[in-house]
């Protein structure tokens, strides 16, 4: 299963979505402080965020060190790329919903 972060802009104006495995998203939800910004229950369809909260989430993720096995095994280079994709989306989106 996977999780897809979708920009809240109208269709045709949205930035590209970010899709990731459930485990990858659940680890993001478990970052300290994330619970003050969004619903961190491990259900894939409950989370939404405003643009301001999305930017705060990006700051938390940027300073976070993912656990081994986070995405693509223990490939630290890939971990940094995935963090970059997620943070870039969160900084540029007009808020998001999860599908």
Kindly label every feature range from the protein language model:
Residues 1-99:
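Acidic (Asp/Glu-rich) sequence patches and key acidic residues
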